[in-house]
UniProtKB/Swiss-Prot annotation:
Pfam families: GidB
Name of the protein described by the UniProt record: Ribosomal RNA small subunit methyltransferase G
EC number, as in UniProt: 2.1.1.-
InterPro entries xref list: rRNA_ssu_MeTfrase_G (IPR003682), SAM-dependent_MTases_sf (IPR029063)
Catalytic EC class: transferase
HAMAP family hit by this protein: 16SrRNA_methyltr_G (MF_00074)
Role: Specifically methylates the N7 position of a guanine in 16S rRNA.
Family, as annotated: Belongs to the methyltransferase superfamily. RNA methyltransferase RsmG family.
GO terms under cellular component: cytosol
GO MF terms, alphabetically ordered: rRNA (guanine-N7-)-methyltransferase activity
Organism, as annotated: Petrotoga mobilis (strain DSM 10674 / SJ95)
Protein's gene: rsmG
Protein keywords: Cytoplasm, Methyltransferase, rRNA processing, S-adenosyl-L-methionine, Transferase
Length: 225
């Protein structure tokens, strides 16, 4: 079997397990919807993106059912992926998926993002999260995890520019990161507009970030002057 066929087979099996798992891991209930909104949305923005392709170890915070981390792990077996979620039922599901799919390049952690940062500070080449939190909150979680001159990605829809961008701008200096590039793309027959916003870590993250468990969401950094 060709490598590409093997990956496609694993993706099909993964979608089947994801939408049929007894604990709700996704809002999508059909293979078509799951493929477009979860698989394609994870792959399209990074398939030609050097900041991702040149990275060796990658972290996905709030991975849920494995989006995008597990999808990326299937397509990039030469890279290491660390998937983090604070909900034990989701991590248990991922253990099953990884075993069934015979994936060997994934490490699972059942931890809060704030605690995970204590043991994996300045460790990763690339960090991401999807649908976890507003951009300023997500950036506080992710910035401490990557090395200086490494990258952070956020998946966003069109509402990012009207609802979230102002909060993003307010945390860049505080976290020693800079916006690096925006990748815009479309998914599905209805051509839904999607964006991957990439940030570069330009200096050491101050030691007080991330703040203690629960504080980033309760008192978002983007709202603090």
């Amino acid at each position: 079997m060709k490598e590409s066929d093997e990956k496609a087979e694993k993706i099909n099996k993964y979608i089947e397990m994801l939408i049929n798992y007894p604990v709700n891991l996704t809002a999508y209930t059909t293979k078509k919807d799951a493929y477009e909104n979860l698989i394609l949305d994870s792959l399209i923005p990074i398939e030609a993106e050097d900041t991702f392709l040149n990275s060796k170890n990658i972290v996905d915070i709030g991975t849920g059912g494995g989006i995008p981390g597990l999808v990326w792990a299937i397509y990039f077996p030469e890279k290491e992926f660390y998937l983090v979620d604070s909900v034990s039922k989701k991590i248990e599901a991922l253990k099953i998926f990884i075993k069934e799919l015979k994936i060997t390049n994934v490490y699972l952690f059942c931890e809060r993002a704030e605690d995970f940062a204590k043991t994996h500070r300045d460790y990763f080449d690339f960090a991401t999260c999807k649908a976890l939190a507003r951009s300023d909150i997500a950036l506080e979680y992710l910035s401490p995890l990557v090395k200086v001159n490494s990258y952070i990605s956020l998946f966003k829809g069109p509402s990012y520019y009207t609802n979230e961008m102002k909060y993003t701008q307010n945390v860049l200096k505080k976290l020693n990161i800079a916006e690096f590039k925006e990748i815009d793309y479309e998914i599905g027959e209805d051509k839904k507009k999607r964006y991957m916003i990439l940030f570069k870590k330009i200096g050491i993250t101050p030691q007080n970030f991330p703040r203690q468990v629960g504080i980033p969401k309760k008192f978002p950094l983007g709202e603090i002057k």
